[in-house]
Amino acid sequence: MTIEFSHTTGLLLLAMPALLLMAAVIKPKQGAAYARAYRQRVQWTSFAAFGLALLAVVSFLFARQQNLMLGAGSLPAGLGLLALSIQVNGLTLVLASLVSFVLSVIARYSVQYLDGDPQQARFFRLLAVTGGFFLLVVISGNLGLFTLAIIATGFGLHRLLSFYADRPRAIMATHKKSIFSRTADALLLAATVLIGHQIGSLEFSQISAYVHAQDHLSIALHVAAWLIVLAAILKSAQFPFHGWLIQVMEAPTPVSALMHAGVVYSGAIIVLRTSELLAADGTALLLLALIGLMTLAIGSLVMLTQSAIKSSLAWSTAAQLGFMMLELGLGLFGLALLHLVGHSLYKAHAFLSSGSMTDHLRQAKVLKNRPISVVAWFTTVIVSGLFTLGIAAAMGLSIDQEPMLPAVLTIIALATAQLMLKALSHGTWREILVAAGAAIAMTGVYVFLHEVFITGFADTLAATPQRAPLLDLLLMAITIITFLFVAWLQGPGKTLMSPERQFALFVHLNNGLYLDRWVERLAFRFWPEKVGRAPKKSCAVIPPNPSGIEP
């Protein structure tokens, strides 16, 4: 094809994964000096990728751009073309900017974190490979290329999670993750074949155009939608397939940050990229919403019982992933994208600063909490709800435009109520007023961003899912009741229990309700794993550390 100025953004996006994958082509050699040079190459390449993302955004804003296709090969059985295709729109630009930024921060942090580690060159090579393929996931314009890139990203993450191969618990958790990930890959491949056979093309733009032109989907496309949702559930560590996400904490902290701030969102990205097809099906998203709601409720409660910082962060990620799946299942695709961006940045910061969390907790003042009465709790929630409703009405949000708006406003109201209740439990009147002002400001900012993402990505993401209004009403009611129950249990509901029931609930939640153990036994029965392998050969010779302190 002829390269034109309108392809500038596509070329910039394509250069991002290309640079990272090229940096990883050279196999690491032995020697400390070579290891340091290798890590510097990957670090500066990640910085360059982020710079290219910013240039791509500028190019997209100031000139009319179109999708890029540099090469294609015909697939058998009329499945269409497997093309090196780059889709240029707001979604791919936002995701590419986010991934490249997080990757550059992690690469910079890893230089100090792994300084002196004999395997640091191998780590940076795996980081470049995984990051490069993940960038290809978020920018690809062809479903076949998208699927292959997701599979490659999964294999790269597997190698990173098992980086220290002499840690049996890490190997076991990584193996369990690989079982679910490979199953999701198979489901996504099957969906790709069904879509290609039915439509005759694997280009995302043509898939969307085909779906819009049809009054009803064929059985093959309905099956493909369900397969995509099941793949997203497995990729996103949804309940009851969440255990590996909690148990991979023995991986290096940069790997935890990469996974929890990026790669674990593969499931959400799958749904966002195929939102037109899933919205046309409608019912598959219903399953996604229910599974996400269950994961959110369990994860948010279990998180409060964890004593280890990284374990608490892992359960928090599981809960937030459930929240994201709930938003996608409700058809709030723009809101889910906003959530993905915000939580990815927060989680990267949380994991990379987890080492200083202990010092922060030691220096923090221990505040004596005053018990919150049932009346005070209900009053705070109602007042917060009224403020949220008023701000939403003032900013022009309407239930006619968003049928799920009552559920969204309930969630916002409960979040701001938690801020107020925290101030009421141990704060002075001045702190309570400050908390009230912060809650109002946060609500306004959130509603504003909500409107920006909903309207800004209206041409890129699907509209409301096509399903019976009664199902939407029932799903909204279940969502509101679940959020109210979880908030109540975290507040006065807990204190109304007897000490024996509180202790029993704590034990059950602390163990994740035990379901993961049954899933683990079943999974390992079909695919057992041997642990305790010797560590791989060192790629760099580093002098011994005389202090005896591990880097």
From Swiss-Prot:
GO process terms (BP): ATP synthesis coupled electron transport; electron transport coupled proton transport
Membrane topology: Multi-pass membrane protein
Regulation: Uptake of inorganic carbon by cells in the presence of thiosulphate is fully inhibited by the uncouplers carbonyl cyanide m-chlorophenyl hydrazone (CCCP), carbonyl cyanide p-trifluoromethoxyphenyl hydrazone (FCCP), S13 or SF6847. Not inhibited by the ATPase inhibitor N,N-dicyclohexylcarbodiimide (DCCD). Inorganic carbon uptake is inhibited by the ionophore carbonyl cyanide m-chlorophenyl hydrazone (CCCP), suggesting uptake is coupled to a cation gradient.
InterPro entries recorded: ND/Mrp_TM, NU5C-like, Proton_antipo_N, Transporter_DabB
Null allele phenotype: Required for growth in ambient air.
Molecular functions per Gene Ontology: NADH dehydrogenase (ubiquinone) activity
Predominant cellular place of this UniProt entry's protein: membrane
Compartments reported by the entry: Cell inner membrane
Coiled coil location: none
Gene Ontology, cellular component aspect: plasma membrane
Keywords for this protein: Cell inner membrane, Cell membrane, Membrane, Transmembrane, Transmembrane helix, Transport
Transmembrane segments: 6-26, 42-62, 65-85, 86-106, 132-152, 187-207, 217-237, 252-272, 284-304, 321-341, 374-394, 404-424, 434-454, 469-489
Pfam families: Proton_antipo_M, Proton_antipo_N
Record function comment: Part of an energy-coupled inorganic carbon pump; its substrate may be carbon dioxide. Expression of both dabA2 and dabB2 (DAB2) restores growth in ambient air to E.coli deleted of its carbonic anhydrase genes (called CAfree, deletion of 'can' and 'cynT'); neither dabA2 or dabB2 alone is sufficient. Rescue is pH-independent, suggesting it transports CO(2) and not carbonate ions. Together the genes allow greater than normal uptake of inorganic carbon by E.coli. Uptake of carbon dioxide rather than bicarbonate has been suggested based on kinetic calculations.
Subunit structure: Forms a complex with DabA2, possibly a heterodimer.
Family recorded in the similarity comment: Belongs to the inorganic carbon transporter (TC 9.A.2) DabB family.
Protein name: Probable inorganic carbon transporter subunit DabB2
